[in-house]
Amino acid sequence: MGKYRKKAREIVFRTLYTYDIKGGDLFEIMEDHIKDIRGKLSKKTVDYIYSILKGIDEHLPEIDDILRENLKNWRLERLGYPERALLRLGVYELLFSDIEDKGRVFMDILDLTKCYIDNPDTVKFINGVLSTVYKNRQKVNQ
């Protein structure tokens, strides 16, 4: 059921990574990423990609502020491009999206981390930061 979301998250991750390196328009970058596979993507997947990117685009300064507040002994600007992209995606989906299955968000982000970075310490780092962000927000909302 949620495979379209996992594929969408991967495309959003790649879009955010490219955006961080080159700048530009998030939606143009995303369209460039999917131009060769668009016909193979379901409408649901493409709609979800647009939904996530729209939300990240609207909330990026706030997402970055949240990350800065929750990074221990790291500066956001010093993180690698893939780590920053994964954390931005994770924070958006955990705190700003209306998706109910937050556990699935964690699992997909960590799977992407393993796939694209393949460093156990980075997987722990991403998990730790996202867990801290999510727990801190839960405390505020209680």
Swiss-Prot record:
Gene Ontology terms for molecular function: RNA binding
Pfam families: NusB
InterPro entries in UniProt: NusB-like_sf, NusB_fam, NusB_RsmB_TIM44
Any GO BP annotation: transcription antitermination
The entry's keywords: RNA-binding, Transcription, Transcription antitermination, Transcription regulation
Domain of life: Bacteria
Gene3D superfamilies (UniProt xref): NusB-like
One Gene Ontology term, aspect cellular component: cytosol
Protein purpose: Involved in transcription antitermination. Required for transcription of ribosomal RNA (rRNA) genes. Binds specifically to the boxA antiterminator sequence of the ribosomal RNA (rrn) operons.
Entry similarity comment: Belongs to the NusB family.
Protein name: Transcription antitermination protein NusB
Organism ancestry: Bacteria, Pseudomonadati, Aquificota, Aquificia, Aquificales
Gene: nusB
